[in-house]
């Protein structure tokens, strides 16, 4: 097994090469029992976090301080402070990265590989997300305790999936801000083991702050891209997941992004990092720190031309609130910047105290016997329970897009398994992956399911060669049923690689069409994070069933065949809109606006209504009937709603109401059901009105045939409110309709009225007039 899997900060590879040897050396815990460090207050566990960290920083020389502002911090040998690599990754499992060292074999040569976040998002299962994060943090802590990773991990990616062309959309849970916000809340809870714990298991890092969702599109690259975003869209769409992460889940780290926001590079933007993040969201507790994305501080000078020298770039980022450089600008140029009087010693100390306060909270300087997480080890990695959870997560996320009752497959027999994913392994992991103990391929799973399998790749992901068609068609003719497995992969979508088309690549649709003409039942399994236009498959009556499986990782093949054979009933929902292929010709990727314009059609399900398949779509092997016990709700009054809200939580998180629906399984198959609750209005607040807005969801588990289940969906005041042009969150009086989207065009509704006056729930900080 490879020493370290590929990691995907593609443009940072040259940066790594330029750093001193030892970037992949094992981390070690400091010795606080003897030696020079033991004489410092940082080793005194009776003191508060800040005092301990400050004592360490006070003991450093200026040069030592500057040297330790980079991600691959060399430590201070003179003080007995070991080197520490801050850059460890764990997007969907401990992942290959400069701070993580996998062994060649044996212990610590692999970790559990969960589905990519885009497939986890399709589960709409908050409890599952926390369970996955808990396992990831346990395994991350095991690697950290063994000196094979840091104790902080640069995950999750919570930029909403705005544009289907984005190469990193696979790393996110979807396009809806509420959904992404709930995802990150439960994920951070699981990773850090609590909401703002005094002693986190690991430190999570929410990225990329903010308005980052472009890699390289038609020559426009992330390192110099200026995202022009209205204050309304910033507050309503781009920032809510970060508010949930920082203010509500109380994450300990945030990463600022490559792009500029309205002319100011994110890592140099005090409006973002100080005014919004640290002040408005009150993200100011000890041990909260900000890292740049890798090379982003260099981009301030080289990409954005925001400063005239790299020393100015270093000082500008430090003054704005960036504490750590994933790069070399800080250690190379902060000395020069100090000589030029561009920042104060107190500002440098502030950054280092934040960083080392984080390590103090993690127990890095404490005796191992006093730290509950230091006992976590190799036996806690990839346990049978973790493998079962990976299987469950993949199965819960898979979405059934089409089915003419061909699925579930009725019997064994001969099965033709065709396509570039038919025997895929690492391909099913997506990016930011680590070595897995095993990866269950579709070919393996089909054999395990008892089928006589005729396998042929047929074609590749993106080729016009038809050399494999004959073998594929021959296999299909010999079979009772045909399963085609294809879609897109990291050669099409990845970090540094956006798409220019959202059609199926290469000649895959051509092969599927030829397979459909053979006359055998044909099932298509579509892989990839971003959606492709399935119009031709949906309209072809000879394509009998269609599934979307995202990147299901190590349990992919077995989870998919559990769905195909009916062992598991599909209940996932699309976490994004599937756009027609021509959509890319209607709006440039650089257009950050969500609402329709004079020449643009709008983005996401809230503003675009011509989807091939809408956000939240998903079929089942059974049928459900939805009813409202009460069709007439309320009325509600704005003043009463605000006055009854508890004072110890932000008012936008306060409860509006809990809505009860009856879900009856009217079919013959036990199945989960994801209840998605949308809100509509045509008179509450100013125009334009969104088509609908997700305000709540829940996943009801294992509803049996004939069973009637009462399902409760909680809605917050913030979900009821709308965002004004100046970014304020406003509760408007008016008439509202609630709609349950059940995926089969049945939309039971209930209505209510809100009376009273317009009420501001959150006054959004206004950007500086000089921007």
Curated annotation (Swiss-Prot):
InterPro entries xref list: BXL, Fn3-like, Glyco_hydro_3_C, Glyco_hydro_3_C_sf, Glyco_hydro_3_N, Glyco_hydro_3_N_sf, Glycoside_hydrolase_SF, Ig-like_fold
GO biological process per UniProt: arabinan catabolic process; xylan catabolic process
Position of the signal peptide: 1-25
Active-site residues from the entry: 293
Taxonomic superkingdom: Eukaryota
Glycan-modified residues: 67, 305, 345, 423, 464
Enzyme Commission (EC) number: 3.2.1.37
Principal EC category: hydrolase
Any one Gene Ontology cellular component term annotated for this protein: extracellular region
Keywords associated with the record: Carbohydrate metabolism, Glycoprotein, Glycosidase, Hydrolase, Polysaccharide degradation, Secreted, Signal, Xylan degradation
Record field: catalytic activity: Hydrolysis of (1->4)-beta-D-xylans, to remove successive D-xylose residues from the non-reducing termini
Localization, UniProt: Secreted
UniProt pathway annotation: Glycan degradation; xylan degradation
Main location: secreted
Keyword hit for Aminoacyl-tRNA synthetase: no
GO molecular function, one term: alpha-L-arabinofuranosidase activity
Coiled-coil regions, chain positions: none
Similarity section: Belongs to the glycosyl hydrolase 3 family.
Function: Xylan 1,4-beta-xylosidase involved in the hydrolysis of xylan, a major structural heterogeneous polysaccharide found in plant biomass representing the second most abundant polysaccharide in the biosphere, after cellulose.
The protein's name in its UniProt record: Probable exo-1,4-beta-xylosidase bxlB
Organism in which the protein naturally occurs: Aspergillus fumigatus (strain ATCC MYA-4609 / CBS 101355 / FGSC A1100 / Af293) (Neosartorya fumigata)
Gene this protein is translated from: bxlB
């Amino acid at each position: 097994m490879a020493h370290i899997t590929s990691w995907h900060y593609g443009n940072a590879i040259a940066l790594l090469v330029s750093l001193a040897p030892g970037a992949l050396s094992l981390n070690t815990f400091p010795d606080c029992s003897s030696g020079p460090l033991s004489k410092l207050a940082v080793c005194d566990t009776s003191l508060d976090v800040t005092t301990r960290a400050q004592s360490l920083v006070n003991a450093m020389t200026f040069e030592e301080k500057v040297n330790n502002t980079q991600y691959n911090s060399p430590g201070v040998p003179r003080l007995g402070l070991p080197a520490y690599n801050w850059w460890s990754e764990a997007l969907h499992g401990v992942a290959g990265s400069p701070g993580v060292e996998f062994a060649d074999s044996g212990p610590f040569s692999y970790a559990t590989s969960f589905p990519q976040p885009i497939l986890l998002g399709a589960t709409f299962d908050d409890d599952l997300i926390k369970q996955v994060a808990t396992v990831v943090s346990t395994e991350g802590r095991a690697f950290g305790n063994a000196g094979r990773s840091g104790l902080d991990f640069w995950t999750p990616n919570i930029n909403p999936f705005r544009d289907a062309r984005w190469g990193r959309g696979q790393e996110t849970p979807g396009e809806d801000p509420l959904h992404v916000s709930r995802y990150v809340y439960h994920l951070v809870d699981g990773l850090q083991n609590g909401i703002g714990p005094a002693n986190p298991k690991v430190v999570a890092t929410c990225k990329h702050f903010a308005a980052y969702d472009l890699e390289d599109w038609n020559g426009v690259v992330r390192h110099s891209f200026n995202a022009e975003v209205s204050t309304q869209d910033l507050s309503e769409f781009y920032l809510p997941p970060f508010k949930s992460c920082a203010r509500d889940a109380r994450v300990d780290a945030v990463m600022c992004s490559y792009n500029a926001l309205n002319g100011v590079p994110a890592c140099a933007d005090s409006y973002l990092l100080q005014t919004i993040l640290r002040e408005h969201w009150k993200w100011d507790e000890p041990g909260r720190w900000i890292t740049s994305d890798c090379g982003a501080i260099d981009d301030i000078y080289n990409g954005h031309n925001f400063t005239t020298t790299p020393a100015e770039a270093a000082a500008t980022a430090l003054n704005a609130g960036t504490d750590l450089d994933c790069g070399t600008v800080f250690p190379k140029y902060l000395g020069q910047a100090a000589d030029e009087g561009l920042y104060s010693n107190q500002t440098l100390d502030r950054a280092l105290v934040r960083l080392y306060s984080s390590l103090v909270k993690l127990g890095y300087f404490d005796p191992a016997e006093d730290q509950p997480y230091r006992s976590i080890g190799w036996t806690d990695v990839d346990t049978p329970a973790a493998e079962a959870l990976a299987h469950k997560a993949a199965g819960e996320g898979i979405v059934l897009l089409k089915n003419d009752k061909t699925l579930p497959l009725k019997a064994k027999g001969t099965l033709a398994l065709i396509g570039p994913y038919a025997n895929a392994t690492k391909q099913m992991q997506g990016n930011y992956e680590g070595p897995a103990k095993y990866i269950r391929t579709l070919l393996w799973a089909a054999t395990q399911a008892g089928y006589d399998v005729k396998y042929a790749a047929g074609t590749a992901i993106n080729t016009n060669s038809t050399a494999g068609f004959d073998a594929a068609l021959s296999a299909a003719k010999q079979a009772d049923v045909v399963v085609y497995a294809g879609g897109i992969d990291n050669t099409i979508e990845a970090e540094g690689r956006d798409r220019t088309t959202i059609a199926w690549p290469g000649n895959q649709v051509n092969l599927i069409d030829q397979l459909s003409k053979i006359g055998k039942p044909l099932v298509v399994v579509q892989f990839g994070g971003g959606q492709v236009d399935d119009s031709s498959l949906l309209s072809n009556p000879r394509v009998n069933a269609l599934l979307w499986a995202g990147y299901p990782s190590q349990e992919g093949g077995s989870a998919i065949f559990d769905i195909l054979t009916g062992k598991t009933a599909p209940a996932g929902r699309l976490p994004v809109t599937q756009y027609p292929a021509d959509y890319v010709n209607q709006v440039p990727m650089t257009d950050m606006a969500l609402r329709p314009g004079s020449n643009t059609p709008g983005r996401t399900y809230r503003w675009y209504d011509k989807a091939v398949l809408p956000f939240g779509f998903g079929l089942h092997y059974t049928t459900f009937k939805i009813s409202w016990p009460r069709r007439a709700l309320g009325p509600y009054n704005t003043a009463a709603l605000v006055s009854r809200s508890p004072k110890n939580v932000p008012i936008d998180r306060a409860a509006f109401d809990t809505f009860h629906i009856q879900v009856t399984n009217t079919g013959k198959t036990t199945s989960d059901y994801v209840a998605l609750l949308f809100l509509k209005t045509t008179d509450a607040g100013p125009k334009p009105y969104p088509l609908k807005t997700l305000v709540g969801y829940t996943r009801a588990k294992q509803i049996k045939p004939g069973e009637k289940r009462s399902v409760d969906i909680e809605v917050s005041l913030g979900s009821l409110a709308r965002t004004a042009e100046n970014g304020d969150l406003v509760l408007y009086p008016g008439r509202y309709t609630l709609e349950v989207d059940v995926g089969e065009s049945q939309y039971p509704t209930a209505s209510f009225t809100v009376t009273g006056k317009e009420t501001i729930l959150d006054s959004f900080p206004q950007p500086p007039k000089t921007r």
